[in-house]
């Protein structure tokens, strides 16, 4: 199923490699974000004051245990968000990689994938009616962060068969005065279109972050192509793995003999490099797929103005 939860599970599977964490189950709904008493089946063996557990993407800190299955808790522990939970929801005890941290890493990777250096994006459109007396158009409802770059500007033609000729001369100005351009964006057209007809702007937009609390949301809401659904878990696993070697270097506890002999320093870094190589290859493939779908058209140049715009200007 293509949901955020599936991404979380894929990330955790890569990091744990078959290791099974201790689980329990809620025996009563958590219907309020201020509720500080939680009941579980009690099948987990480690319930005690100081234990941390998670339900969905919320972390809880146990402040007391009564009867083996009634827990007094702090809510929203560790920077997670307190929310409601249903009866029979799964409880993960002392998770090595909390869900909320995995979701944060997934969003960090979606942002990274949207970098021009990585070449992934979602294509979106907006439109407005052309007015011959107006040169600059406000891109209402958008923000500068939502537009990486504009791909094309076309307008509705008239005739027996409607076409959409391309406007090749335009420029996008950011950080405009919001009293004139409420979005802070001004699209300046240097060539005309048909008055009263729709102008359509296609633009490359960053991938959309996933919800930190609704793990049932579909992955398609990010704007990522289905063929690239394997990328965010790879990036998230890499990000979470980078902090793993730090713990073994703490000076307040002696490392186990297994750490010293079976998992020598550098072993974790080798696993990280394997993930990085796999992600790099997949990223190149998906970026190439987008280039093929939306090829660069060198005749399109927002910096070029028609000759009429330069008339009357001196050479010096």
Segments from the language model and where they lie:
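Short glycine-/aliphatic-rich beta-strand segments at the starts of folded cytosolic domains
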Residues: 36-39
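Acidic glycine-/aspartate-rich tracts in secreted/extracellular proteins
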Residues: 43-44, 64-69, 75-81
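Glycine-enriched, solvent-exposed interface loops adjoining structured elements
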Residues: 1-32, 45-60, 69-70, 83-316
């Amino acid at each position: 199923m293509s949901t955020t939860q599936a991404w979380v599970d894929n990330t955790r599977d890569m990091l744990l490699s078959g290791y099974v964490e201790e689980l329990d189950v809620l025996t009563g709904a958590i219907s309020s974000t201020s509720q500080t008493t939680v009941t579980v089946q009690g099948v987990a063996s480690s319930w005690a004051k100081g234990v941390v557990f998670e339900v969905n993407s919320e972390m809880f800190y146990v402040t007391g245990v009564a009867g083996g299955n009634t827990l007094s808790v702090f809510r929203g522990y560790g920077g997670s968000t307190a929310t409601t939970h249903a009866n029979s929801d799964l409880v993960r005890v002392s998770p090595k990689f909390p869900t909320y941290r995995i979701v944060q890493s997934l969003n960090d990777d979606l942002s990274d994938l949207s970098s021009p250096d990585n070449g992934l994006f979602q294509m979106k459109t907006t439109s407005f009616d052309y007015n011959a007396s107006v040169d600059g158009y406000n891109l209402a409802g958008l923000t500068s962060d939502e537009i990486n770059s504009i791909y094309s500007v076309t307008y509705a033609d008239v005739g027996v068969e409607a076409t959409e000729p391309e406007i090749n001369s335009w420029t996008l100005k950011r950080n405009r005065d919001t009293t004139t351009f409420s979005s802070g964006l001004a699209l300046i057209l240097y060539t005309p279109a048909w008055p009263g007809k729709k102008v359509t702007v296609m633009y490359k937009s960053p991938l959309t972050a996933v919800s930190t609390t609704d793990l049932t949301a579909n992955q398609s809401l990010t704007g990522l192509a289905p063929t690239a659904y394997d990328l965010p878990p790879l990036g998230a696993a890499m990000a979470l793995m980078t902090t793993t070697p730090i713990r073994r270097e703490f000076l307040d506890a002696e490392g186990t003999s297994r750490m010293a002999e079976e998992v020598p320093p550098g072993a974790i870094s080798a696993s990280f490099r394997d993930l990085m190589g796999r992600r790099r290859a997949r990223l190149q493939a998906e970026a190439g797929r987008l280039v093929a779908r939306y090829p660069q058209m060198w005749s399109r140049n927002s910096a070029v103005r028609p000759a009429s715009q330069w008339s009357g200007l001196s050479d010096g």
